[in-house]
C-alpha cells in the first residue's frame, strides 16, 4: 500500500520536473517594480567617471544621470536613489554643500525630476558624509565625536532643500537617534507633507561598504561604529524599527542586505510599513569580481542574490543591477 505522507508516495521532485512546473510553483518572483537604482552624480566632470572598485558603475555627469533615469523608467524600475559627489574644495566640517540649493545633489534632483516627472520615484540620500571634510555622517564636537543633536539640525535643513529640489522620498542614512521625527517635522513645517521618508532603520557598520567609499569620494578616517549598528546584534534592529515607526517613517530599510537576511526577515515580520533592503557595493563587487574570474555564473548569481533578498521579506531592493535585471525580467 502506498503511503502518501512520506516516501515513496510523497515525491517533492514532481514539482521540479520542468522549467514551466518550477516557474508555476515558485514562491518568490522578482519584478521590475521591486527595484530602486542607486546612482552617483559628480560635480564638475564632463564625462562619466568609472568606479574601479565597482565594475560597470560610474559617477555620472548631470546629462548621463538624466539618461540613466530615463532608462530606468523604460525598464520598469520604481525608483532612483541619488548620491551627490561634490568637488573636494567644497567639503567642509559642517557639510554645507549638502544644504546649498545649488549644490550638486539638489541640482541633480531638479534635473531628474525635469527628465522623468512622476514616472520614477526620485529619492535622495540624506546624509552629510559625502559633503564633510572628515567623512563622518554628522558634525563633530570639540572632542572629534559625532554630535547627535547638532547633526539633527543639519538633517532638518537637508530634508527641506532636498524636498524643495523635487525629491519624492528622502532617505536618512546617518543613523542618528531621533532623525526620523526631526526630519518629518522639518518637512511638514514647509508644507511638504507628501514627501515620504525611507528610514535606514537597521544600518550596520559593515566591511562591505568599502567600494562605496570610493564611489562617493569619502574622506573618512576611522570608522562609524559609534552610530551604525554592531554586526553581532539582532534585537536592537527591532528597537530601531519601533522608534522609526513611532517617529513617522513611511518605509524602512535594512542595509546591507545579503549578510543580514536574518535581520531583514525579523524586520519584515514586525513592520506594518513597506520594507526595503540595500544590496550594497561590496555585495555587488564580490559577484562581479568572481564572475570576471570565471568562478561563478554572473547572471545566475545576480538573480539568486536578489531572489534571496526578496524571499527574506524585502518589498523593494536597492541594487546597482536594477535596470539591467528589470530589462531581463520584462
Curated annotation (Swiss-Prot):
It catalyses: 2 5-aminolevulinate = porphobilinogen + 2 H2O + H(+). The keyword Amino-acid biosynthesis does not apply. Pathway: Porphyrin-containing compound metabolism; protoporphyrin-IX biosynthesis; coproporphyrinogen-III from 5-aminolevulinate: step 1/4. 5-aminolevulinate 2 binds at residues 281, 320. The active site is at 203 (schiff-base intermediate with substrate), 255 (schiff-base intermediate with substrate). Mg(2+) binds at residue 240. GO terms for molecular function: porphobilinogen synthase activity; zinc ion binding. Keywords: Heme biosynthesis, Lyase, Magnesium, Metal-binding, Porphyrin biosynthesis. Pfam families: ALAD. Its EC number is 4.2.1.24. GO terms for biological process: heme biosynthetic process; protoporphyrinogen IX biosynthetic process. 5-aminolevulinate 1 binds at residues 213, 224. Homooctamer. Belongs to the ALAD family. This is Delta-aminolevulinic acid dehydratase. It comes from Streptomyces coelicolor (strain ATCC BAA-471 / A3(2) / M145).
